[in-house]
Amino acid sequence: KKESNGEIITEMYPSMQLGGKPPQLVDQVREGVVDLIWTVAGYTPGRFPRLSVFDLPFLPTNATATAQAVQEFIETVGAEDLKDYKVIAVHVHSPGMIHTKNKLIKSLDDFKGLKLRGPTRSATALLKELGATPVGMPAPKIAPSLSKGVIDGMVVPWEIMPSFKLQELTKSHTNVAGQRGLYTTPFLFIMNKAKYESLSPAQKKVIDNNSGKSLAKHAGKLWDKFEGPARDLAAKAGGEFHTLSGAPLIEIKKAADKVVSDWIKSANKKGLDGQKLYDTAKALISK
């Protein structure tokens, strides 16, 4: 608003106040029902086949580095996935971890019999390989599902815990050792293409100046910033913590390798080079 001298004004409608369900957002913005959306790419499985590589386990580092990687990816090898939209930015959250109501995960056997919420197709595939029963649902449904016993826990990043008071509903928190986190998932901040094209050159410049890798990096930094405070709240709520390492971590990574292998095969069947996409994503994160 400031940079456009009041010409660009946005109205926010959280919690799907304009109707529909979260998976419908990408169609709403493409069709012009809304002008801008911020959503999880994984809510529409199969819609963004290249970008979904960033859902794979043991790929992300921190959100700051991974967000810049995913933005560069979508500007280059993954551009086809978002060709129908004006991309403002694509970013990720900090690596997610496992949170349960009571049972602290210390080994592969501890997953058996647990109903755990997974946010994306790759995350639910990993949970299944680990022996858990995966349950898919958007983040706002996690708290009531925990309260009603629909799920025993979930895999989410620390940052969203306080927003839904999940630290009060889960007491056991398990992370993985090493520089690569258990998982992350891309968020899309995208705009209706026709709406963008209808703007004046000066207005477009304002949007362009506040888009791309710098915005993705800023978003990643914010997620990283709130990781520690959220963990502190869980500790104050009486939470117990464990970091998987050694033999248990090796077993979990074997299960993760199966998820990665299956994703590459699936991508190849779609006419993509799954191995190249995976190697590119990994290299961009390591830059």
Regions found by a protein language model. Give the residues of each.
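N-terminal secretory/targeting leader peptides
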Residues: 1-64, 80-287
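Signature of the catalytic double-stranded beta-helix
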Residues: 68-81
